[in-house]
Amino acid sequence: GAKVFYVMGYNSRFSILSDIEIMQLNEVVTRTVKSYNDPDCVTIVADPLHCSTQTSIDFAKHAEMIGADVISLIFREKVYFEEQVYNHYKEVSDNCNIGILIHEMPLNNGIPGQPPQIDWSLELLDKIADLENVIAIKEDAKKDEYTDKVSRKLCDRLAVITSGYGMKQWMKFTPHVHSWLSGSGGFNPAIEVDFYEAWLANDIDKCNDIIENVELPFNTIKDRFGWHLGIKSAMHVMGVMSRQERMPLQQLPDNDFKNLEKMMEEISNRSPYLVRRTK
């Protein structure tokens, strides 16, 4: 089954949760996972999408208190110079005793007349990687050349997680990328476990079969309906969770949802992994 549980800010709808609700969610996930007493299970919780450095420190201390293993820190404030980003991570690192994961995605540029988003420089990531409590990075730029440079630069110091086209993307960059984000594994963790075991056994045909018949077809849903609404609606179809949303987010319109149901049925017919759950 699944071993690493990551409460991610966007997937977990942090933008429409209060800080107290985010802490409650972090705690519920952590205590639920830890209740199984499996030493191999890891919980990664997160701070709010937009907050002060002090709030990030408060969340890091709370994560430590509830027994989480790692806190994922995102930086969504406008950036005017790189030292601003470094100082944020350093301040949190200096004031907590929990592992820190860098949620690296394009930064919001505060300089007018410049590109609205900018990538983290390798020099900046190199400095942050040397901070005492920083142990991992979620590489979320979704640019192959950049991902390759970042993973090669940091793989000997940090656990590197890639995002976007999970298993297919991971195969491109292994051994410099240690793990990938699981989308299709949300329906059945065996998808990801079997893929990894096939990789270790050098059964590349099986790896490609899982990618071709599960991951890539599911990505057509993401591309058509959007990742966050698409995956939640698909999980509703498979009996995993409700597709209900909190406004201003709203669930897919009924016609779109019916089309998504048909697409999920087609994927299920191609793969033994996707079996609808029953209560």
Predicted region positions:
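General structural feature for long, well-ordered alpha-helical segments within catalytic domains
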Residues: 21, 25, 55, 59, ...
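Short glycine/serine/threonine-biased micro-segments
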Residues: 7, 162, 237
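Active-site beta->alpha loop and helix N-cap motifs at the rims of alpha/beta catalytic domains
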Residues: 1-119, 248-250, 270-278
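Conserved, mostly hydrophobic/aromatic
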Residues: 29, 63, 92, 137, ...
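C-terminal alpha-helical cap/extension of soluble enzyme domains
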Residues: 2, 176, 188-279
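Catalytic alpha/beta core domains of metabolic enzymes, predominantly
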Residues: 102-215, 219-225
